[in-house]
UniProtKB/Swiss-Prot annotation:
Belongs to the universal ribosomal protein uS9 family. GO terms for cellular component: cytosolic small ribosomal subunit. This is Small ribosomal subunit protein uS9. The lineage of its organism: Bacteria, Pseudomonadati, Pseudomonadota, Gammaproteobacteria, Alteromonadales. NCBIfam families: PRK00132.1.
Length: 130
């Protein structure tokens, strides 16, 4: 591997992404597939690119990602978090701008567990007066 490689681990919901960034031409590879091929929906692709567009490094870095667990939204969020951490490793001066955009903080929201006696996490069974 290259000597100038930067790493960041990103997490969101049940997804975990391992992100490797190095100098290049702007290729983003997710699980051995190009970004456009891996994510079918445009919003997920947009979420992944957000930190790179913010610091204007879209065509300066090659990003290699392995991501596990969760669905499309969770994986996209995990990749975004990982890219943000890799960028901060590359240049600590980028931290304030990334923080103000809200990319540094890990989104702690997870699926709430189903409770006994309820139909879902909070949905109660239908009540009948008579």
């Amino acid at each position: 591997m290259a000597a100038t490689q930067y790493y960041g681990t990103g997490r969101r919901k049940t997804s975990t992404a391992r992100v490797f960034a190095k100098a290049g031409s702007g290729n983003i590879v997710v699980n051995q597939r190009p970004l456009d091929q891996y994510f079918g929906r445009e919003t997920a692709r947009m979420v992944v690119r957000q930190p790179l567009e913010l610091v204007e490094m879209t065509d300066k870095l090659d990003i290699y990602v392995t991501v596990k667990g969760g669905g499309i939204t969770g994986q996209a969020g995990a990749i975004r978090h990982g890219i943000t951490r890799a960028l901060m490793q590359l240049d600590e001066a980028l931290r304030p701008s990334l923080r103000s955009a809200g990319f540094v903080t890990r989104d702690a929201r997870k699926v709430e567990r189903k409770k006994v006696g309820l139909r879902k996490a909070r949905r109660k069974p239908q009540f009948s007066k008579r």
